Curated annotation (Swiss-Prot):
Catalyzed reaction equations: L-aspartate(89)-[ribosomal protein uS12]-hydrogen + (sulfur carrier)-SH + AH2 + 2 S-adenosyl-L-methionine = 3-methylsulfanyl-L-aspartate(89)-[ribosomal protein uS12]-hydrogen + (sulfur carrier)-H + 5'-deoxyadenosine + L-methionine + A + S-adenosyl-L-homocysteine + 2 H(+)
Family from the record: Belongs to the methylthiotransferase family. RimO subfamily.
Residues annotated to bind [4Fe-4S] cluster 1: 42, 78, 107
All residue ranges annotated as the Radical SAM core domain in the record: 161-398
UniProt-recorded name of the protein: Ribosomal protein uS12 methylthiotransferase RimO
Length: 472
């Protein structure tokens, strides 16, 4: 969807449904040491789940998608906003009812007392990215097998919960910003960037395994390397600067689509746009702006010069005309007046953003924003949300219409009896629109095809595959 509201099983900018690992070909051998796994929340959490699952495989455990067959269940939780907390607690409850032996990890795990008050029978609780602690607890309750029949079956890239043709690449943990509506720093700590060489090694393995699209994620992607104090790392025998522009340039040389998510609006974002214009990385910018009223942005502790943001958008589009901009906004923030909201609507009209998500402010336990001003009534929040959505739907339809008649590369995600479903450079998986190619039932997921866009609406595109000699 181009414009969406928050639903359970969804995060601030990316919609990642709860996933139980499907027992695939690597489950062919029965070990008697079976672990069930439920992963909730954002793509960053999904990467954490993949790391835990990979180590479980290395340690010889079988991962099952059945509560009944599991000797223990791990629930990797989200705790960002109240709806996510509710979903996580529901998942813990279900795991306890269906199995009884549960380890909880992830963001909500940082609030152990909140979980224990409701579910005191949970075996163990750990916070986010506590991989070693989770594995230690698993070994305690389900001893590690002496013989590991899975070692030769573990992919070089580790266990992945995404389709084979795309993968999330997490480049850092934590965040140094202190947005008043957010509690991520208290859950995941300050910025901690991975070494550039380690990131590039992982990216290379992903591409060699057949991954066609790398989705770069973190809490604050554009801040990558700020904590490295200018230190250079090495990769493939060559020095690599540890900043987001240098990292993106190296990733762009690997032959896969590179899509950047969670770009905080720092001034040096300007340096990324030429890479998009050159075709090194996708011309797609996920840059959460949150609001447009200077007063509200100040209360949020976000950058507050809307005029500069509009100038930047114009500048970026002049450099890279195909640029697609995704953003997210909060309506009904404490203290938001009708005048503040109108400033936001005026900003949308002028900015003409491509993809936009809207959230009605929700109190988050521990967030400063809950007490800085009078809370907005649910009726007012609902009214502003619908007005926001209605306006942005018109803008999104207008922006998508510019693709009609053009021929684009389409990455196929799924094929059914009616045809193929894919995405263009303008579409991130699960949160943006899709490209429908009716009648093309012979295509396969992971294929990259050229297709001419024939129709559009406010969310999606329709296309037909073209031969090489008829392409634009």
């Amino acid at each position: 969807m181009t414009v969406e509201t928050f639903k359970p099983k969804q995060t601030t900018t990316l919609d990642t449904p709860a996933k139980r690992l499907e027992a695939a070909s690597t489950n062919a051998v029965t070990t008697g040491n079976r672990i069930g796994f439920v992963s909730l929340g954002c793509p960053k959490n999904l990467v954490d789940s993949e790391r835990i699952l990979t180590q479980l495989r290395i340690d010889g455990y079988e991962v099952t998608n059945s509560y009944d067959n599991a000797d223990l269940v791990i629930v990797n939780t989200c705790g960002f906003i109240d709806a996510a907390v509710e979903e996580s607690l529901d998942a813990v409850r279900e795991a306890l009812e269906e199995n009884g032996k549960v380890i909880v990890t992830g963001c909500l795990g940082a609030k152990e007392n909140q979980i224990r008050e409701v579910y005191p029978d949970v075996l163990e609780i750990t916070g986010p990215h506590s991989y070693e602690a989770v594995l230690k607890h698993v070994h305690k309750y389900v001893p590690k097998p002496e013989h590991n029949p899975f070692t030769s079956l573990i992919p070089q890239t580790g266990v992945k919960l995404t389709p084979k043709h795309y993968a999330y690449l997490k480049i850092s943990e934590g965040c140094d910003n202190r947005c008043t509506f957010c509690i991520i720093p208290s859950l995941r700590g300050d910025l901690n960037s991975r070494p550039a060489g380690s990131i590039l090694d992982e990216a290379k393995r992903l591409v060699e395994s057949g991954v066609q699209e790398i989705l770069v994620v973190s809490q604050d992607t554009s801040a990558y390397g700020k904590d490295k104090s200018g230190r250079t790392d090495f990769w493939d025998g060559m020095p690599v600067k540890q900043d987001i522009t240098s990292l993106a340039r190296q990733l762009g040389k690997m032959g896969a689509w590179v899509r950047l998510h969670y770009i905080y609006p720092y001034p040096w974002v300007d340096d990324l746009i030429p890479l998009m214009a050159e075709g090194l990385i996708l011309p797609y910018l996920d840059i959460p702006m949150q609001h447009a009223s200077p007063r509200i942005l100040k209360m949020m502790k976000r950058p507050g010069r809307v005029d500069r943001q509009l100038e930047a958008i114009q500048r970026w589009r002049e450099i890279c005309p195909d640029l697609v901009i995704r953003s997210t906004f909060i309506v009904g923030f404490p203290g938001e007046t009708e005048e503040d909201f109108q400033i936001l609507l005026d900003f949308l009209k002028e900015a003409r953003l491509d993809r936009v998500g809207c959230f009605k402010y929700s109190e988050v336990d521990g967030a400063v924003a809950n007490t800085i001003a009078e809370l907005i009534s649910e009726d007012v929040k609902e009214d502003r949300y619908h007005r926001f959505m209605e306006l942005q739907a018109e803008i999104s339809a207008e922006r998508l219409a510019r693709f009609v008649g053009r021929t684009l590369d389409i990455l196929i995600d799924d094929v059914d009896e009616e045809g193929a479903i894919g995405r263009s450079f303008a579409d991130a998986p699960e949160i943006d629109g899709m490209v429908f190619i009716n009648g093309e039932t012979e295509l396969e997921p992971g294929m990259l095809v050229r297709a001419r866009i024939t129709h559009s609406d406010e969310h999606d595109l329709w296309a037909e595959v073209v031969d090489a000699d008829t392409q634009d």
